[in-house]
Amino acid sequence: MSRSNRRVRLGQARQYQPLRSPLRYGRRVDDQEFVQRVRRHVPASLVPIVARYGAAFSEQEQYFKRHSAQYAPWVLAEVARASLVYGTDFNRKPATDDDLLSCCAAYQSLPDRELERDEEGAVGNFFLRLAGEQLTFQQSVLNDLARTAALFEQTTPRKVLRTASPGWPERLLGCRLKEYVGAAILLHTSALKNAGTFDLKWLTQPNFEEVTREVPADVLRLVIEKQYMATREELRAIQQEVEGRTGVPNRDYRRFGFNPLSRRPVVAGLADTLVIPVPGFIVRRASPLGIYYSGMAQWGSGFSADLGELFEVYVGRQLDLLPDVRVLPEIAFGRKKGALSVDWFAVFDDCVVLVEVKSTRPTEPIRLADGRAGEELRRMLGHAVDQLSTSAGRVRSGEPGFEEVPSDRPMVGLVVTMEPFHTVNIPFTSSHLPQCDIPFAVCSALDLEHLVTVSDVSVGRLLLDHLTDPNKKGWSVSSALTGHAHGRNAVIDEGWASYPWKEQPEFTGGV
């Protein structure tokens, strides 16, 4: 079964015919002009229109067209943020659909100044920014949501966790994990079916009995209000808090920075109903990434360490799905066994894949591709690459403790990250990482979840051919999957099956 056929749709957006976009700006637009164009309109008028289009054009096939590309979710997300964070009600006009089109056209006319100046490294930085802006909205809804349960509830750690101990979701989120993700499924589906809106009053309507039978209405209301919802004032405060901690981006690249809707994707106080400008942010909030940020805010590095332990075991669970592999855990070696190898060795007939796991995600400097990006990449991924080289050397030398790992076949490596570093393998970006003794690639949890479902060829042979092909240097692991047959991912399916409404019942709120 192909990956596209396995995709779960949480709701089907209504068909919507967009206004055709004439050439609104035959010139470059700077960030200040873009923000001022958005600020012409009352947020309570503009943002609900953004939500209507966000629901209608949430899927790639809907906005990957000539006359609807201006309504891509990353464009709408920035229009909504500019209105909510910088907008005002004083002396402003109501917005129309045509006004939204002009705001989106202004956004698309924003240049990349570094690229224009043809500075050294400008092309690589441009792709870093572009990937962080756009590819976040092109991930699998099924995998991102199912991974939450599969990682946090269905993966057994090998040691006692410091903060993520039994009952931690209730302490952190105020509810069980399935209720937290269930609320996201409900909000996402409602947004797509109800023009980007949700009304809390719907929870007590008779047509919601199928929903509230699984999760009580009062629980859903509490979760939505406490974990997903914010007013304009609260969103502004979140923006200011993050910028106070990470710094204010260069004005030319402000649009690539933090968006408070990623933390609180449901807006209250604009209308009689709740407004959901960008449905994709609902999924992000309920994914392991969203929970990571909540856990870090409350518990700090203790939660990060627990997540690292869980993610390492989770990667092992994914590798165990392969039918033709022997998976070996990390090896303690050296004086008093104080040194550790890579986290996993996947032994195939054709090769050995060394796997180092990093529960990390791109930070603000990487998303902005600013002067700190190279240092950040080295800090987050450099040790993982060194681990591949060190462990490969130990295998070759037959060091005590490594006897189970065959030294008679080629070795390749994977650095598996929690979240995608989309362009990290291209030569410009990978030049910031240490040299490695074996061919390797950085891949995300999502890439691995898809890789292990390949059913028409050994994954070991697939990786060996892909990573040693000089014509594919810098290609992503996901590019190696094109044209191959895929089965189901049992770990992802088990995670999804733990949620309420997994059969996707029809609920359309007040419509």
Where in this protein do the model-derived segments appear?
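Extended, hydrophobic alpha-helical segments in both membrane/secreted and soluble proteins
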Residues: V315, L340-W344, V355
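Beta-sheet entry/capping signal
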Residues: R326, D343, D350-L354, P410-L414
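Active-site beta-strand-loop-beta-strand hairpin of nuclease catalytic cores
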Residues: A346-I366
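Catalytic cores of nucleic-acid endonucleases
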Residues: S359-L414
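Short acidic, S/G/P-rich loop/turn micro-motifs used as interaction or catalytic elements
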Residues: R361-P362, P420-T423
